[in-house]
C-alpha cells in the first residue's frame, strides 16, 4: 500500500487560478505595483503582469530598477489604451472600435501583448475600406506592426483597389515613393489596364511638385507596351510629364516601336511588354466536338475549378498544332471548311495575344498541312511533314517571326503524318506517326545548328543534310499521341497503332514512355487509366495533365487525367470536366491580365 502512487489532474485548475487573480483584483487585495500613465494610476499584481506580458516579465525578473519599485511611470502610451490592455490581462476580453483601436494597439505593442496586437490587426483589416485605408496604413507604420500575414493582407487590399485609392488625397499624401515603387513592380496590379496605372502615377506626382524628381525612376515600372496605341498618343504624349521626363519619352518610343513591329512582338520580350500576371491559366483551344467542326474557341480552367470561355478566330478551323512564343500563341494548319462544303487541309496561321484577348492572321504556310508537328527554336517555328486529303509529304518549313515569312528547310527523312513534335535542349524531337507502310516507333531529332545552306534548302526535294538524326526507338509504335518535355526529359502519352492502313483498323496504345536524352533510352511508365488519342497535354503544378480526346471505347472525352512523374501514378477527377467532349484540342498555360479575366467572368 505504501508504494502505490496515483496522480490526479484538475480540469478547472487554470480557470480557478485566473478566477483567483480576478477576485483579488476586484477586491483590491495583494496588489503590489502601481503603474502611472499620464495622470492615471493602475494597481495590479506583478505576478499576473509577468505571466501575460514579456515586457513586464523582463521588468520584474531581470536586473532592472523597476523590479523592486512599488510605483512605476510608463510613458509613450495613453491611459485609455492601457486600461483596455490591463482588463484583457485579467479578464481575457477586450472591446475594439475605430475610436479606440489606435490607443489599444499602441499600448499592446508597448507591453508586448501579442495576442491583443493580433486582435487589433484583425479588426482593422476587417474594417478596411477606401475611406480609412490611409489611416490604417499610418497606424501600422507608426507602431511598427510586423505580425505575420498582416502586411500581406493590407498590401492585397491596396493592390486590389490601387487605382481608386490613388484618387484620394489622404492616400496620395501618405503613400511614399518606396511603397509606390513596390506596388508598381507587383504583378497583382494586373486587374487594372496599364493606362489607368499611368494616370494614377500622374496623380501621385501632381500631388506634390517635389515628387517630380522621381518621375524617371517611377516611369520605368509602367508597362507602356501593354497599352493601346491610342492611349499612348492621346493620354501619355499629351501630358506635362512627357515634356519633363526624358525616360518617359524613351519608354514611349519603345512602345511605339513595339506597336509598329506587330509580327516581331513575340520576340520583343521586355519588362514593358510582359503581362502583369502572378499565375498562368490552363488554356484549351478546341477544334472538334465529336465529328463536328467548331470555331476555335478558347476555354480557361479558372479557380475555383470552373471553366470559362473566350472568343476564338472567326473561321471554322480545327488547328492541328500550337506553338508558344513568349506568351503569344500560334495556331497552325489543321482542317477548315472549303468552298465546296468539304473539309480540307489548311495552311492558315493565327496568332493569339492574351494581353488584348485578340487574334491576328499571320502569313500562311507554304503548303496546307494537317496531322503534322511543330516546334519553336529561337525565332523560328518549324512545321514538319503532314498530309492533305490526297498527299502525304516530308517537307519541312520554318516561320521566321521577325519578317512573317515561311521558308523550306531540310526535309524530314520520310513521308509521315500523325506524328508528334517537342523541343528539348534546342532540338526538335519527332516521334511516331504513320509512314507509307505502318505506324512507327521512330524517333528523329532535328538540330538547327546543322541546317544546310540556302542553296541546299532551295533544292529541298533533292538534298538531305545531316540535320536529322535517328535516336533510340520508342517501345511502342504509335500515332496521334501526345508528347511533352518536362524536367529535361520527354514524356509520350497514348495514341493508337494502325494495323491495317487501308481500313484504318487500329488498336489503342495506352502506355506512357519517358525518354532520357543523356542515355538515349526509353522507359515504360504506368499506363493511362483510360487510353486515348487526339487529346491535349500540359504541365500544371508539377503534374502532367491529359485532357479530352477519343477514348478506346469509341467515346469522346471531357475528362482530365493527371500524371505525377515523380511517383509514376495517374489520378482521375482532380480537375472538373470540360464543358464539352473534345477531340483534337490544343492545350497550353498562358498568362492573362486580370482585366481580361474580369471581362470573361462577366460574360460567363
From Swiss-Prot:
Compartments in which it is found: Nucleus
Positions of the BTB domain: 31-98
Pfam assignment, any one: BTB
Ranges for the Kelch repeats: 328-379, 381-426, 428-473, 489-542, 544-590
Pathway entry: Protein modification; protein ubiquitination
Entries under SMART domains matching the protein: BACK, BTB, Kelch
InterPro entries per the UniProt record, alphabetical: BACK, BTB-kelch_protein, BTB/POZ_dom, BTB_POZ_KLHL15, Kelch-typ_b-propeller, Kelch_1, KLHL15_BACK, SKP1/BTB/POZ_sf
Record key words, sorted: Kelch repeat, Nucleus, Repeat, Ubl conjugation pathway
Highest taxon of the lineage: Eukaryota
GO molecular function terms noted in the UniProt entry: ubiquitin-like ligase-substrate adaptor activity
Main location class: nucleus
Domain BACK: 133-237
Tissues of expression: Widely expressed at the mRNA level, with the highest levels in lung, muscle, and spleen.
Gene Ontology BP, a term: negative regulation of double-strand break repair via homologous recombination
GO cellular component, one term: Cul3-RING ubiquitin ligase complex
General function of this protein: Substrate-specific adapter for CUL3 E3 ubiquitin-protein ligase complex. Acts as an adapter for CUL3 to target the serine/threonine-protein phosphatase 2A (PP2A) subunit PPP2R5B for ubiquitination and subsequent proteasomal degradation, thus promoting exchange with other regulatory subunits and regulating PP2A holoenzyme composition. Acts as an adapter for CUL3 to target the DNA-end resection factor RBBP8/CtIP for ubiquitination and subsequent proteasomal degradation.
Subunit organization: Homodimer. Dimerization does not affect PPP2R5B-binding, but is required for its proteasomal degradation. Interacts with CUL3. Directly interacts with PPP2R5B; this interaction leads to PPP2R5B proteasomal degradation. Interacts with RBBP8/CtIP; this interaction leads to RBBP8 proteasomal degradation. Interacts with PACMP micropeptide; interaction prevents ubiquitination and degradation of RBBP8/CtIP.
Protein name, per record: Kelch-like protein 15
Organism: Rattus norvegicus (Rat)
Organismal lineage: Eukaryota, Metazoa, Chordata, Craniata, Vertebrata
Gene name for this UniProt entry: Klhl15
